[in-house]
Amino acid sequence: MKTVYLIHENRNWSEPLEDALNKIGVPYVDWYMVDRVINMATSPPGGIFYNRMSASAHSRGHRYCPELTTGLLAWLESNNRRVINGSSALRLELSKMVQYSTLREVGIKFPRTVAATNAKGILEAAQFLKYPIISKPNRAGKGLGVKLSYNENELKNYIHSIQLSIN
C-alpha cells in the first residue's frame, strides 16, 4: 500500500484525517509545512501527496506556508508524483481573481467583482459598483474581513478601521 503524505499547516484539519487513515490502516506521513525543509536536490519519496494548504494560513501565524507549498507542489509535480489538490488547486485557493475567472470560464455566474490592492484602490473600485457592496479580502479565512457597506461612508469607515489582508 502506498504511503499518503499529508501536506498542511493546520493540525485541526489534519487530525480527523489522520484518525481515519489509522482506522483503515493506510500509512501516512505528516508534512506539516510550518517547519518543513525541502531538499530540492533530491527526488521526492514515492507515494500519494494530499495537499490541504489554506490561503488563510497567515491568520494562524503561518505567513509563508502557501508560498512554500507552491514550491513543494512544483517539485512533486516535476518529479511526476501523484498529487491530490496540486498546484492548480492551490492557485485557485490563493486568488479570488483566479477563482472568478475560472467560474466565468465554466459559465457560473457570480456578483460583479472589482479587485484592488489597498484602501485607495478599494474606494476607486467602489465607483464601478452599486451599493450595497460586499468587500472581501483575497486571503483571510473563516469569513474574516467580509463586510457589507450600504454607502461610501460606511465603506470608508470600514477600510480605515481594519488591517488589510496580506494581498
Region spans (language model):
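Conserved N-proximal alpha/beta basic substrate-recognition cap immediately N-terminal to
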Residues: E9-R112
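Extreme N-terminal starter segment of soluble prokaryotic enzymes
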Residues: M1-Y5
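Active-site nucleotide/adenylate-binding loops and adjacent lid/helix of ATP-dependent enzymes
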Residues: N80, S88-N167
